[in-house]
Amino acid sequence: MASTTLSDLPDVILSTISSLVSDSRARNSLSLVSHKFLALERSTRSHLTIRGNARDLSLVPDCFRSISHLDLSFLSPWGHTLLASLPIDHQNLLALRLKFCFPFVESLNVYTRSPSSLELLLPQWPRIRHIKLLRWHQRASQIPTGGDFVPIFEHCGGFLESLDLSNFYHWTEDLPPVLLRYADVAARLTRLDLLTASFTEGYKSSEIVSITKSCPNLKTFRVACTFDPRYFEFVGDETLSAVATSSPKLTLLHMVDTASLANPRAIPGTEAGDSAVTAGTLIEVFSGLPNLEELVLDVGKDVKHSGVALEALNSKCKKLRVLKLGQFQGVCSATEWRRLDGVALCGGLQSLSIKNSGDLTDMGLVAIGRGCCKLTTFEIQGCENVTVDGLRTMVSLRSKTLTDVRISCCKNLDTAASLKAIEPICDRIKRLHIDCVWSGSEDEEVEGRVETSEADHEEEDDGYERSQKRCKYSFEEEHCSTSDVNGFCSEDRVWEKLEYLSLWINVGEFLTPLPMTGLDDCPNLEEIRIKIEGDCRGKRRPAEPEFGLSCLALYPKLSKMQLDCGDTIGFALTAPPMQMDLSLWERFFLTGIGSLSLSELDYWPPQDRDVNQRSLSLPGAGLLQECLTLRKLFIHGTAHEHFMNFLLRIPNLRDVQLRADYYPAPENDMSTEMRVGSCSRFEDQLNSRNIID
């Protein structure tokens, strides 16, 4: 009797199985062993990202007939205008070929340096509903005002609902006239994303008012702007009121100051100044947006007495689930234990982020933990009055719901203190971000902080004791059998469900102390992101030869890494005497990476801002070639063709790409290593190899 195979399963069961497999490579593997699954996969797949060289688009198969979401932004050579290198007649033929292979496209992502590529592609799919444009290069001066957007509204006006410009560098004066010119199309837009990180000043007040008037049916609006009253046409009370009046259907609103986008870790001093946004206007805005579900206001200047407005937010926007506040003061004063105030009254929140709130105290955190009983995600940044006691209490109160915690730029919360604070959920947390700030005498510092808190805030300590009695949390008994004098567990922690870890570390520091802080047992950690930031110029040579990546080998399931040295600044060329150039720093950062069993790596090389160069060095290429298990490698910078050839020694490497996804991206191919011919030759060699599996 013949054995039963996967193909013998009924189509209904096979379809259910296929819907449970989300990983693209796993689906492709299943397609190789089952003809039924192959036919089902090809006929039902709706999302497709095309990689490979743009010159080979004619070889795209025509079996994916149900594709509705098509991403062409990662074609190689990355960052070049699609089809521009081909003769005009070939360009039209390739555009028609794409239409034939994917006839039902409704969502399109494309990298465009000029409107010519849009003029070719968009007529092929007149029923497009969503378009995402990408461009990190400077806008060409010969493009007429609004020229980047006219093809979109001209060819897709009948069905267009969503426009995403979050990764598209453009001039802010380009968009409002086009929206006015195509008023009927603008009126149908429900999603507009203008949160572009490459802006220096962002959208002006009058431009935001014009945009929201042209798009009265917006449900999602994200924009980068300037709240600083010292700037011309800054965003203040009038602008916020106009947004609420013109777009009352908003469910998602993000308004972020460009200074926060340029330097997200900045902690303003007492001289930061006040914004032109008042609590009274915020109450009016919240009243005008009753459907709001997600709100981000990162103002960059102090918003005083915001607690009253946040109390109104709870009563006016009952559907609110996600809230992020930057530079808001008085978010939760917690002056009375019996009465919750400020953001603590927003009991429906599932995600809360508080940034640079100078007057937030431990008692405020405890009140938030009591009031926001549905929190699954919590982020705190730049809150200097918060200590390990308050954060630990808040985490304990929400131990049954919290799975994602991010702690950064809090002077009283170094690495050890942060981990002690979230210890009550060490067996439940799935995603974590902390700063790697090492302390020589951690216990003494923690004890000192507690004593200082007791001396300065007796009333708050009394309230803290009452909170212990009322809440009856007993995390010590749950998580450990013995505790030290500060109430922290002395047994080893096991981070059973931790899957993603994000770390920030200052340049010149070492990663090696990380396991000794209590993060040594993470059996299910799959992905890690490490951001190294700082100025190498003037730094002494590190005492040890390596940064410490080899210490990550103790995580058995670690397979994905993002190593971001993009904000590490140094000398790309010859360094002054007694200093290290970036190639030596890159050797310091990457030494030991070959000991990790990584399958995917995103790497941002350090940069020299004076010459706008982020390039993989010879030591860097030599160390990356030691990652023998890599399958995907994306270098967010440039590299010599000779250095790229080192990577061909990685046996199973399938996908490699150079991406200058930073502003301004290198403009002239002759001044960089990212020439079309170089990239094409390397990809040809990569694709000609036999891959074992």
Curated annotation (Swiss-Prot):
Question: What does UniProt give as GO cellular component?
Answer: nucleus; SCF ubiquitin ligase complex
Disruption of the gene: reported phenotype? Increased shoot branching.
* Region called Disordered, residue ranges: 445-465
Subcellular location, principal? nucleus
GO BP annotations of the record are: auxin polar transport; auxin-activated signaling pathway; bud dilation; cuticle development; negative regulation of seed germination; positive regulation of response to water deprivation; protein ubiquitination; regulation of meristem structural organization
| Record pathway | Protein modification; protein ubiquitination
Q: What are the subcellular locations of this protein?
A: Nucleus
Question: Which conditions up-regulate this protein?
Answer: Up-regulated upon binding of EIN3 to the promoter during methyl jasmonate-induced leaf senescence.
User: What keywords were assigned to this record?
Assistant: Auxin signaling pathway, Developmental protein, Leucine-rich repeat, Nucleus, Repeat, Ubl conjugation pathway
Q: In which tissues is it expressed?
A: Expressed in the vasculature of growing leaves and roots, rosette axillary bud, flowers, siliques, funiculi and stems.
Q: Which residues form the F-box domain?
A: 3-50
- Keyword presence, Repeat: yes
Q: Which InterPro entries match?
A: COI1_F-box (IPR041567), Leu-rich_rpt_Cys-con_subtyp (IPR006553), LRR_dom_sf (IPR032675)
Task: Quote the SMART domains the UniProt record gives.
Answer: LRR_CC
Covalent S-S links between cysteines: none
The LRR repeats are found at 9-34, 49-74, 75-100, 110-135, 141-167, 168-196, 200-225, 232-257, 274-299, 302-327, 332-356, 357-382, 383-409, 410-436, 480-505, 508-532, 541-565, 608-637
Q: Which domain of life is it from?
A: Eukaryota
Self-association state and partner proteins as the record states: Part of a SCF (SKP1-cullin-F-box) protein ligase complex. Interacts with SKP1A/ASK1. Interacts with CUL1. Interacts with SMXL6, SMXL7 and SMXL8. Interacts with D14. Forms a complex with D14 and SKP1A/ASK1 in presence of strigolactone.
Quote the function comment for this protein: Component of SCF(ASK-cullin-F-box) E3 ubiquitin ligase complexes, which may mediate the ubiquitination and subsequent proteasomal degradation of target proteins. Promotes the senescence. Is necessary for responses to strigolactones and karrikins. Contributes to the selective repression of axillary shoots and moderates the branching by regulating negatively the auxin transport in primary stems, in an AXR1-independent manner. Required for the progression of leaf senescence mediated by methyl jasmonate. Required at each node to suppress axillary bud growth.
Q: Domain comment, in the record's words?
A: The F-box domain (1-55) is required for activity of the protein and for the interaction with SKP1A/ASK1.
Q: What is this protein called?
A: F-box protein MAX2
Q: What's the source species' lineage?
A: Eukaryota, Viridiplantae, Streptophyta, Embryophyta, Tracheophyta
